[in-house]
Regions:
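Accessible peptide chain termini
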Residues: 1-2, 27
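A cross-taxon signal for low-complexity, glycine/charged-rich
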Residues: 2-5, 17
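Catalytic cores of Mg2+-dependent Asp-rich isoprenoid enzymes
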Residues: 19-187, 192, 196-311
């Protein structure tokens, strides 16, 4: 349930294989598009499940439609060759297409597809608009003052994904708190995985600035071969914050009405817990800390069982 996900079993379903093939084909077509700047990434490149086989088959196309727009707009924000002004202008066009202010532009079809999906399902467009606002923030904001500042970013970049899925499956708003907590954890964990890359390629640091100052961590630490003592302290503080959020997130799968969504959520919770352990032990500056095939298999099987046999 966050901006960034991969299938738990390590295998793609036929639906996912078809979608990924179509998406990679679309990359070539979009390359000539003056608005999009595709990287070629798709749902198979993410850390956590994106519309996996666990979700109801009838709803997976709506998840794919939402993801495709998120991917396209995220790629714009992450394009180092574009100026901040250019990024904002492109993202603004996608947002205006979502809200109906730009009614007929073939280059904005991904926004129109989300509008059609929203009309068909009743899911609020705000969940897509919030993501675009997060990417606009990425275009102009490269540092975060404190944990609350970082959580404010996650409220736009991560929480809307979980809320979209809850609304799509007919869950009530009372589940938002647990979903927000889980999605925000996934976002922070992804930031910790990509600390060096985000700084070196985009000059972004998704760490609380006050924690860095207190620990004696400096920007240059992100260009070293391994994690410094000060930076390790900040990483561990972020993991402590994630652990607190997971206390809210872990009960979520047992609270959901839709059993298939509960299974997917239970899998994601276990993947998040596993990545928390790996990031405690590993050095994300020396090498990217990532989940392995056995992690996906183990978390997938345990999560599915937990979702099936809920109390």
């Amino acid at each position: 349930m966050a901006r960034h996900d991969r299938q738990c079993s390590g295998h793609k379903s036929p639906d996912d294989l078809t979608y990924n093939f179509r998406h990679r084909t679309d990359v070539k077509q979009a390359a000539a598009n003056s608005i999009e700047t595709p990287t070629g990434k798709d749902s198979g490149d993410e850390n956590f499940p994106v519309g996996s086989f666990l979700l109801p088959k009838a709803l997976r196309p709506h998840v794919a439609t939402y993801y495709v727009l998120a991917r396209a707009t995220d790629d714009i924000a992450d394009n180092g060759a574009l100026s901040s002004e250019d990024k904002l202008a492109r993202l603004d066009r996608f947002e205006k297409a979502l809200t109906g202010e730009i009614p007929d532009d073939p280059a904005l079809e991904k926004s129109y597809a989300v509008r059609r999906s929203a009309q068909a399902t009743g899911v609020p467009l705000q969940h897509a608009i919030d993501l675009i606002h997060a990417f606009k923030q990425d275009a102009v904001k490269q540092r975060y003052d404190n944990w609350d500042d970082l959580m404010g970013y996650c409220a736009l970049s991560a929480s809307p994904v979980g809320r979209f899925l809850l609304d799509l499956h007919g869950e009530d708003n009372a589940k938002f708190a647990g979903s927000d907590a889980l999605c925000n954890v996934l976002q922070v964990l992804n930031h910790l995985q990509d600390l060096a890359e985000d700084y070196q390629t985009l000059n972004r640091i998704y760490l609380p600035g006050d924690w860095m100052a207190a620990a004696g961590a400096v920007v240059d630490d992100l260009e070293r071969d391994s994690t410094t003592t000060g930076l390790r302290r900040v990483i561990d503080q972020c993991l402590d914050g994630c652990e607190e959020l997971m206390k809210q997130a872990r009960p979520l799968s047992r609270q959901l009405t839709n059993r298939r969504l509960a299974m997917e959520t239970a899998v994601i919770v276990r993947l998040a817990d596993r990545l928390l352990v790996l990031l405690r032990k590993g050095d994300p500056i020396a090498a990217r800390v990532a989940l392995g095939k056995l992690d996906f298999l183990s978390c997938g099987l345990r999560g599915i069982a937990a979702g099936l046999f809920r109390k």
